[in-house]
From Swiss-Prot:
It is found in: Cytoplasm. This is Ribosome maturation factor RimP. HAMAP family: RimP. Keywords: Cytoplasm, Ribosome biogenesis. Belongs to the RimP family. Required for maturation of 30S ribosomal subunits. GO terms for cellular component: cytosol. The gene is rimP.
């Protein structure tokens, strides 16, 4: 998923503090709106609980208060990726080859921006997804949002 310049800067700023607490920074989303939201996804081999989210929120808030990279009012949310885990990097897609995913593209491919299929392969910055029996290839930079589809 192509990150905005702000999201790239924020990722660089908060990766070290998150990792220092023993967590993986899965990714971030900055959603602009009347009340903007900075959403941070963390994970660990042991899973994530509410106290973990609070610890990361406290640490990240301190970094953001000093650096002050966001010029508008916003809410900070820290959570686990959940069952419908968002995918941000080529490594995330590679980790979940064989899993079903929904994609929202920045620019339409074949007149479609929304796609759902099974991740087949990752080649550099290109993601192959099998959609209705046909392989479709998407540039990571054209993927606005991607989430795993949970099955119960």
């Amino acid at each position: 998923m192509g990150l905005s310049t702000l999201e790239q800067k924020l990722t660089e700023m908060i990766t070290a503090p998150v990792e220092a607490l023993g967590f993986e920074l899965v990714g971030i989303e900055f959603i602009r709106g009347r009340t903007s939201t900075l959403r941070i996804y963390i994970d660990s081999e042991d899973g994530i609980n509410v106290d973990d989210c609070a610890d990361v929120s406290h640490q990240v808030s301190a970094v953001l208060d000093v650096e002050d990279p966001i010029t508008v009012a916003y809410n900070l949310e820290v959570s686990s990726p959940g069952l419908d885990r968002p995918l941000f990097t080529a490594e995330h897609y590679a980790r979940f080859v064989g899993e079903e995913v929904t994609l929202v593209l920045r620019m339409a491919v074949q007149n479609r921006r929304k796609w759902q299929g099974v991740i087949k392969a990752v080649d550099g910055e290109m993601i192959t997804v099998t959609v209705e029996g046909k392989d479709e290839v998407f540039a990571l930079s054209n993927i606005q949002k991607a989430n795993l589809v949970p099955h119960f």
